[in-house]
Amino acid sequence: MMAEERTDLEAQIVKDIHFKEIDLVNRDPKNINEDIVKVDFEDVIAEPVGTYSFDGVWKVSYTTFTVSKYWCYRLLSTLLGVPLALLWGFLFACISFCHIWAVVPCIKSYLIEIQCISHIYSLCIRTFCNPVFAALGQVCSNIKVMLRKEV
């Protein structure tokens, strides 16, 4: 009975991961496009004082820019959004696969192998270098330096 309940729970967790609710209002909850993609009319087109166009031209330009940007984005996202989502999903799946099945095992293997070498290296340092530097330290510890300031 316990194993059956556990598999039902695991199946529910897997289902929840793939079919979680998405927020249709806040579509950038982590603010990854806060400063990059947010481009308004005022960020692109500006008229300095003394070189103003007619007010009607300015209003129509604003409306044209805003509406064309809005509908062009909608058209491009309709045509290319799903194929690009598929492409990016595939790419990140490949990256995750390589990281899980190649990168991490290689790093772990390297760390295991280097641990053996580090013990030998440490033994060599303690055997050969430590006595030499200890002797040099003893020799140099008796050196006295006297500084005189000549006027």
Curated annotation (Swiss-Prot):
Coiled coil: none annotated. Sumoylation with SUMO3 by PIAS4 may reduce agonist-induced internalization and desensitization of adrenergic receptor ABRD2. GO terms for molecular function: alpha-tubulin binding; calcium channel regulator activity; connexin binding; molecular adaptor activity; protein-containing complex binding; sodium channel regulator activity; transmembrane transporter binding. GO terms for biological process: actin filament organization; calcium ion transport; cardiac muscle cell development; cardiac muscle hypertrophy; caveola assembly; cell differentiation; cholesterol homeostasis; cytoplasmic microtubule organization. There is a cross-link at residue 38 (Glycyl lysine isopeptide (Lys-Gly) (interchain with G-Cter in SUMO3)). It is a peripheral membrane protein. GO terms for cellular component: caveola; dystrophin-associated glycoprotein complex; endoplasmic reticulum; Golgi membrane; sarcolemma; T-tubule. PROSITE patterns: CAVEOLIN. Keywords: Cell membrane, Golgi apparatus, Isopeptide bond, Membrane, Ubl conjugation. It is found in: Golgi apparatus membrane; Cell membrane; Membrane, Caveola; Cell membrane, Sarcolemma. Residues 1-83, 105-151 are cytoplasmic. It comes from the Eukaryota. Expressed specifically in skeletal muscle and heart. Residues 64-114 are annotated as: Required for interaction with DAG1. Residues 84-104 dip into the membrane without crossing it. May act as a scaffolding protein within caveolar membranes. Interacts directly with G-protein alpha subunits and can functionally regulate their activity. May also regulate voltage-gated potassium channels. Plays a role in the sarcolemma repair mechanism of both skeletal muscle and cardiomyocytes that permits rapid resealing of membranes disrupted by mechanical stress. Mediates the recruitment of CAVIN2 and CAVIN3 proteins to the caveolae. Belongs to the caveolin family. Homooligomer. Interacts with DYSF. Interacts with DLG1 and KCNA5; forms a ternary complex. Interacts with DAG1 (via its C-terminal); the interaction prevents binding of DAG1 with DMD. Interacts with TRIM72. Interacts with MUSK; may regulate MUSK signaling. Interacts with POPDC1. Interacts with CAVIN1, CAVIN2 and CAVIN4. This is Caveolin-3. The lineage of its organism: Eukaryota, Metazoa, Chordata, Craniata, Vertebrata. The gene is CAV3.
